[in-house]
Amino acid sequence: MRALIFGRFQPFHKGHLSIVKWAFERGYSELVFLVGMASENYTPRNPFTAGERIEMIRLSFLDAGLPLEKAITATIRTLETSIGSVYYVLSYVPRVDTILTRNPVIAKIFLDAGVNVERPPLFNRDEWRGEKIRMWIARGDDRWRSTVTPSTARFIEEIGGVERIRWSLASD
């Protein structure tokens, strides 16, 4: 079985990685990561490019000892939320059996389009949340490092992600 995980992944963090592990435990053999809002980057809400987010997914898989061949990545531009978007999304990814989402609007439009939806559990949502991680990075709070895998933290630093987030929030 193949599942779709649709997200912004700003950044890809341990909450996302926990959903990956949960999905494999549930019997999904492959996961398709659709990196949303691919056309927006260098903003406070979306500081990383689509390519950088794909790299974070790959690094997180490697750090966790998960097989890369079980991950398929795709990107999609920023879309309005509508039932028509479901068909557009599905045309950008390989066939999937299910979408894994906690977003009730996304779940509803995919259900209405006839796609199976499964709601993953929350994993340490108090800390593993993109908005909070970006806030910690902006404030110079090193707690952000514990929310992503070691290779992802190094990657964020190597690409100037810390400075980028601080700059984007200062200019907002």
Swiss-Prot record:
One of its GO terms (biological process) is NAD biosynthetic process. It comes from the Archaea. InterPro entries: Cyt_trans-like (IPR004821), NMN_Atrans_arc (IPR006418), Rossmann-like_a/b/a_fold (IPR014729). Pfam families: CTP_transf_like (PF01467). One of its GO terms (molecular function) is nicotinamide-nucleotide adenylyltransferase activity. Keywords: Nucleotidyltransferase, Transferase. One of its GO terms (cellular component) is cytoplasm. SUPFAM superfamilies: Nucleotidylyl transferase (SSF52374). NCBIfam families: cyt_tran_rel, PRK01153.1. Belongs to the archaeal NMN adenylyltransferase family. This is Uncharacterized protein APE_1986.1.
